[in-house]
From Swiss-Prot:
<dbReference type="GO" id="GO:0015633">
    <property type="term" value="F:ABC-type zinc transporter activity"/>
</dbReference>
<comment type="similarity">
    <text>Belongs to the ABC transporter superfamily. Zinc importer (TC 3.A.1.15.5) family.</text>
</comment>
<dbReference type="InterPro" id="IPR027417">
    <property type="entry name" value="P-loop_NTPase"/>
</dbReference>
<keyword id="KW-0813">Transport</keyword>
<keyword id="KW-0862">Zinc</keyword>
<dbReference type="InterPro" id="IPR050153">
    <property type="entry name" value="Metal_Ion_Import_ABC"/>
</dbReference>
<comment type="function">
    <text>Part of the ABC transporter complex ZnuABC involved in zinc import. Responsible for energy coupling to the transport system.</text>
</comment>
<dbReference type="GO" id="GO:0005524">
    <property type="term" value="F:ATP binding"/>
</dbReference>
<keyword id="KW-1003">Cell membrane</keyword>
<keyword id="KW-0864">Zinc transport</keyword>
<keyword id="KW-0472">Membrane</keyword>
<dbReference type="GO" id="GO:0016887">
    <property type="term" value="F:ATP hydrolysis activity"/>
</dbReference>
<dbReference type="InterPro" id="IPR017871">
    <property type="entry name" value="ABC_transporter-like_CS"/>
</dbReference>
<dbReference type="Pfam" id="PF00005">
    <property type="entry name" value="ABC_tran"/>
</dbReference>
<keyword id="KW-0067">ATP-binding</keyword>
<feature type="binding site">
    <location>
        <begin position="35"/>
        <end position="42"/>
    </location>
    <ligand>
        <name>ATP</name>
    </ligand>
</feature>
<keyword id="KW-1278">Translocase</keyword>
């Protein structure tokens, strides 16, 4: 295993956002987290990268775990000139070759000299993906990374992510509020609404009564699901107590 959450809870003031979450992520596994707006999906990812401190529970991490993170959006001050190359060398200086390779992996080659504020939403998401891939992550976190992309852009984005996974064996946690889009090779879907409502293969979750009740679906609604081959995993790491 790469990462395990045990009874993890997060509060904002008196408001309980995540309630006793238990999740384990294996090497090479793709996990998709779905849920309505305000269900705690983004909070969960921010907790995993250490941006939010849980009030209780523990996070167990594999030794020397490297995590890459692609946020929903990046707010850029239009008055601040910054090229893609400069952005990708902060805070760590990297060679032109390394930057170029990361952009190719993310499906947006040759934009090193462009200004960040000149990029389209889809282009910026790919640059953010390139930034995450620079870390050579063992675990890649995607927070609604395809939001704003059209269908072709979404498919292409996922293809580049899947190619990176096959190349490196990294695991992926992908967050989405779009109930009808599940990455082709998803091993497991977790339905979240403050608590874990249900989880399992895409086929299992799409037929779960809890899933249908939460999202107001009936039997005529279709979730895109795919056959897949589960990954086998081993764990060697340490426990981080946070509560």
């Amino acid at each position: 295993m790469l990462l395990s959450l045990h009874q993890l809870s997060v509060k904002f003031g008196k408001h309980l956002i995540l309630d006793r979450i238990n999740i384990s992520i294996g090497r090479g596994e793709i996990v998709t987290i779905v849920g309505p707006n305000g269900s705690g999906k983004s909070t969960l990812l921010k907790t995993l990268i250490g941006a939010i401190k849980p009030v209780s529970g523990c996070i167990e991490r594999a030794e020397k775990l490297k995590v890459g993170y692609v946020p929903q959006r990046l707010h850029i001050d239009e008055a601040l000139p910054m090229t893609v190359f400069r952005f990708l060398t902060l805070p760590v200086q990297r060679s032109k070759k390394t930057i170029s390779q990361a952009l190719v992996r993310a499906g947006i080659p040759g934009v090193e000299k462009q200004q960040l504020n000149s990029l389209s939403g889809g282009q910026l998401q790919r640059v953010l993906l390139a930034r995450a891939l620079l870390e050579e992550p063992m675990l890649l976190l995607l927070d609604e990374a395809t939001q704003g992309l059209d269908q072709r852009g979404t498919v292409d984005f996922y293809q580049h992510i899947d190619s990176f996974r096959k190349e490196t064996g990294c695991a992926i946690i992908m967050v989405s509020h779009d109930l009808h889009v599940v990455m082709k090779n998803t091993d497991r879907v977790i339905c979240l609404n403050g608590q874990i409502c249900c989880e399992g293969t895409p086929e299992k979750v799409s037929n779960s009564p809890e899933y249908k009740v939460l999202f107001g679906l009936d039997d005529n609604d279709v979730l895109g699901v795919y056959r897949h081959k589960a990954a086998s995993n081993q764990f060697n790491g340490s426990v981080l107590n946070v509560g």
